[in-house]
Amino acid sequence: MTTVETAVGTTQSMVLNMGPQHPSTHGVLRVLLELEGENVIRAVPDIGYLHTGIEKSCEDKTYSQAITLTDRMDYLNPLGNNLVYCLAVEKLLGLEVPKRAQYIRVMLVELQRISSHLVWLGTHALDMGAMSLMLYCFREREEILKIFERFAGQRMMTSYIRIGGLALEPPAGWREHVKRFLDMMPPRIDEYEALLTKNPIWQGRLKGVGYISAEDLIALGTTGPGLRAAGVAFDNRKAFPYSSYEEFAFNVPTRTESDCYARYLVRVAEMRESVKIARQAMEKISDEGLIKTEAPGIIPPEREKMKTEMEALIYHFKIFTEGFSPPPGEAFVAVESPRGELGCFIASDGSPKPLRVHFRSPSFINLQALPKMVEGQLIADTVACIGTIDIVLGEVDR
């Protein structure tokens, strides 16, 4: 069964539609399941219900205008989307971002990673019947969103990371707010693990379920926690450091079991590592310094300069009305999102609008592993497998 059209049952089997409105698909994913009794013999994911045309829309905007579209792709990782897009444009322009801005970027995207994993853990636990975790995880996520609101004035679609640096200077009192959260988070993760990790019901639902070999994952191009749960310690922050990640000390959590339980353990361990990275970044951020590089005609000037310098006023007007024109060429950058390798390819023809924008979205590629995970499993285990892949349909369809 390779297409939706060929997913028809025989007299011995039944075809069941799971989704696109099923709550456990976490969006509008439709999965056609061919069943023999309660056993899944074939599965076909059917995507496209949330197609928004973000890539094509980016090609109709100037380079700066397209940033706001990237927020809405993986809506649980908007800062990560901003980052990969801005890094690609900066590579195209040959811009060097100030260290202070790089450290702030790292701190915020690691908080975003924790926030994304909290949504995953809460919703996955709810799918498995553990309602309390949903409430606890969203309690902690709320604190992260308050930090984002303090920095950017917006809780989710922040557009805070900009080409050449950041949109705004960090607000007064941010350091105490972030430190308070980072001090609070490790005991809360201990609390989650006390409820789940050794719980026999939780283990019974996840252990040995959804196994897929490392060879199959590599062949499919899968990345992220799913690949690391199969024993492959690949993480773009270590393999191809960006935004000064080479200056940070952290581990890449791995397991070897490659089942749903291993994927759960890897993500929980990743939250602990993100707390470490965010704390190191916070300590590296100085109270004074540049938050964006100085590049007249590309980076908007400071508002104070616009009051006294005519050139700054002209640059500001031209950047926001006409945009800037990178030299013709191509750039590709990959970062480590909460779901795996998130890449951005941009082709420039020398005009103020990109010729082509393409995102390598990890959710889209990781979803290919679902049939191999669920075939031969019980239908109830399909819910567990979808949960541990951790897909975001806005990124799958984009």
Question: Positions of the model-derived regions?
Answer:
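Metal/cofactor-centered catalytic core regions of large enzymes
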Residues: 1-398
